[in-house]
């Protein structure tokens, strides 16, 4: 470990400059989810459970956005290592065309059949009626978010990690203000409840896109080649399909798996309380993982650039070892802090703030302890899958390692314990986390094999 961590100050300074803005961007984004949950929770547990259930299909949209963003980032980071700017414009063009088409199809489905889709998420029909107005609106916000996220990924991949932090900081302030006005009907605005939360999100996403469009047309770092952007060519489409579409499929099925976990909770005998607790703890858990997500994204940029520059396999292995150990140590520190805060802050202050009492508070504590204890495992998985393997062009294995433990272990085990055996919530919570224990050793084996290193910018015969 100590040998792997022995790097000069410039290395860690560069890692911090990449990680810091990305972590802050994620903190801002996840804080928005927490603020949304806090505001909706003031309407009652039923409203919060309804929005949690409505966000199950929405999470699929988020996963597709992240998949397109991550997939195009693989190509852009390696093209950036070669300083091939026209190919960056082509990659953005392909990603934008395919991404918007996918997001629009799902948004239309949510708009046309909201109640029917909500009925699949929970066995409580009154939650479907509460959540349907939210679902009709929220899907269209991710059409604009798709375009913004692709441009943020491009800026991040050319080492301008602060752009996304500034953009999402602006949109979070706007979204929070609009939430307050539209959910509660302040300053002369109508009181729209959960529908107001969706409209506020849509307006903030439109503002994000407008800022990205303005910056894209003026950027000197990656000046857009409009001809390459709108006519990217079949070769770029082929490369995107080869290397980015598996990432998109990966994120889609990973998102579907997470959504099914929520559906399982939504069909328990204590579904309203479990959904409310899960809504709060899901957001809090993500807040503690923001640094790990930042390190994972920074790892992807550094690995992708190093491959594009033509560094040797030994150099790439040394780099991957260093980044892995940094992530594990950071994850362990975060786990200790988070677990200490459960009795000191969450139980006496945070849970009552979100109207979680009695059974809901007990379930939230259960989810907190199991989720926080697994942070080091999540941290390494994020760095290995979304950072090292994915940036190395090892798309098949990064997908298999992330999906197999989830679909073959976590989902069936959680369903068995929650729906068939009606097991204690502690066992259900541990089953939700089971995939992490399996994923980590397999990721380590794959990275040590060195077979994950691929230069995806080279023609087929030269790799």
Task: Give the positions of each predicted feature.
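Short alpha-helical transmembrane segments in multi-pass integral membrane proteins
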Residues: 1-22, 76-141, 189-244, 303-374, ...
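Helix-terminus/linker motif at the lipid-water interface of multi-pass membrane proteins
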Residues: 27-49, 118-125, 181-192, 252-283, ...
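Transmembrane helical elements of multi-pass membrane transporters/channels
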Residues: 17-36, 137, 148, 171, ...
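Hydrophobic/aromatic residues within transmembrane alpha-helices of membrane transport systems
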Residues: 24, 36-40, 51, 76, ...
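Short runs within selected transmembrane alpha-helices of multi-pass transporters and secretion channels
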Residues: 69, 138-156, 164-172, 197-212, ...
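N-terminal transmembrane alpha-helices
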Residues: 7-38, 42-43, 59-71, 75, ...
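Small-residue-rich hydrophobic transmembrane alpha-helices
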Residues: 48-108, 145-164, 275-342, 379-398
